[in-house]
Amino acid sequence: MAAAALRDPAQGCVTFEDVTIYFSQEEWVLLDEAQRLLYCDVMLENFALIASLGLISFRSHIVSQLEMGKEPWVPDSVDMTSAMARGAYGRPGSDFCHGTEGKDLPSEHNVSVEGVAQDRSPEATLCPQKTCPCDICGLRLKDILHLAEHQTTHPRQKPFVCEAYVKGSEFSANLPRKQVQQNVHNPIRTEEGQASPVKTCRDHTSDQLSTCREGGKDFVATAGFLQCEVTPSDGEPHEATEGVVDFHIALRHNKCCESGDAFNNKSTLVQHQRIHSRERPYECSKCGIFFTYAADLTQHQKVHNRGKPYECCECGKFFSQHSSLVKHRRVHTGESPHVCGDCGKFFSRSSNLIQHKRVHTGEKPYECSDCGKFFSQRSNLIHHKRVHTGRSAHECSECGKSFNCNSSLIKHWRVHTGERPYKCNECGKFFSHIASLIQHQIVHTGERPHGCGECGKAFSRSSDLMKHQRVHTGERPYECNECGKLFSQSSSLNSHRRLHTGERPYQCSECGKFFNQSSSLNNHRRLHTGERPYECSECGKTFRQRSNLRQHLKVHKPDRPYECSECGKAFNQRPTLIRHQKIHIRERSMENVLLPCSQHTPEISSENRPYQGAVNYKLKLVHPSTHPGEVP
């Protein structure tokens, strides 16, 4: 009766198929890495537990796939209910498992493990509470599964020994194995009185072992690796069936080089190796604690999510209020219901709109209590306060400069690496910061939201407006320590300081000439390349510098703003007026130098000389060689 209960699942005995979960290929793709690893661990643990009870008569397709490191999904075309009912799926020789025609094999319901199902009742399948002692250290464990896992902590011991069947051969993951496969098409039959190579160790020991259907030897199945070793009676390996998974080779390939433990799939080996390397790749974003396994991180994050019943279906983030979840969903949908009335920009949250409006109003409500500096955002004030407290945990390894936050260090690091990850889709120009790209894109849109209240001139950047306003106020906050000269911009002061130091950091790669400003180097390079990027829209003439183009444009304009105060003549360029005024200066100087003759007066004559279209006047003294009545 007890043997029948073990053989017949209908009478309450659990089979591996009863606790197996199947996924299609589409469903398997939807699982993340942590969920896949958890599924593999659970399936292998279930198989090991049922195998330890002697209820496994063949290796499941799912377990075979996991042992080979393959994805354990099943085709959508397979009807798992009918396949499991007739015992077809996963059976050795079945179409689904090996792709060959099924042979006449004993079914799962009428095959019993020799030496297991005959002398054991369901009550005897599990050990009583902590009544399974370890024969190495004497520790008592509650069942055979925990005992098998515990015995792996004795890597140099050899606990699995079959003294009657294989003398001196010990079942250990640290020993080399003799892999033998039984030909499932020709089951081995023994005559009466002869030793069977597939006979189990149940005849020789009372340990709860299971039969290896490939090598014919008993093994202990644990929740991570299975161990098996066999030496057949005839000393010769049997022919392996084509397509049968060589479980022993999988164990040999997935062996830990540190402890010698062998695993039936590579993912389990990778997880095991983290014990030796102490690697903890999974970090909690809330508290920064690291974990070895993704499942442990998922379990830990539930501590932070207590009191947050609202979960985002897109990213799995939890929120304590439904309104916060609604606002968060706009990140995935791209919805931006809040619009700025000044520039028309949209925002997903009202708080972001309030912060943006301070750009137009210039409001800075957050004041630093140490230096009195104001900020438009609270986060900027918090970062600024670290300057006074001296908290600069992030230091650049290249130049030693310290930063208050890691993001600032990352931005600074691009100065050394030259990285420019942000590209403008309009002109293809690259930038090192996203803020620089946003400001640059205004050049293409032509937007100038920042207007000067004095002259009405508009600018695309607020910083440019602040610099321009110093023209009206006359403010020059930057002073040179050497000569005391004042400047309205810090860049002008830096360029001026190089006059005192003689520093010329910008070198031309073509001729080796040095310059004290980058703009001067750029203008100089155009001499080598012949580039003339500035073109006159009137006549098409090109220039190397923008200032030369501005001067040229005055030729086409009718206005002549520069007028001579002596003769009233007007000019379109100031240098031309200065050259013209030198004519009047020479005229006055000649009148003072030449002594007037009593009979003749100095006469001023002019002659045209085509020097760039200008008229040069030459002072001549027209005087005869002798006066009338004089003797030469």
From Swiss-Prot:
The keyword Zinc applies. GO terms for cellular component: nucleus. InterPro entries: C2H2-ZF_domain-containing (IPR050636), KRAB (IPR001909), KRAB_dom_sf (IPR036051), Znf_C2H2_sf (IPR036236), Znf_C2H2_type (IPR013087). Residues 14-85 form the KRAB domain. The keyword Transcription applies. Belongs to the krueppel C2H2-type zinc-finger protein family. May be involved in transcriptional regulation. This is Zinc finger protein 792. It comes from Homo sapiens. The lineage of its organism: Eukaryota, Metazoa, Chordata, Craniata, Vertebrata. The gene is ZNF792.
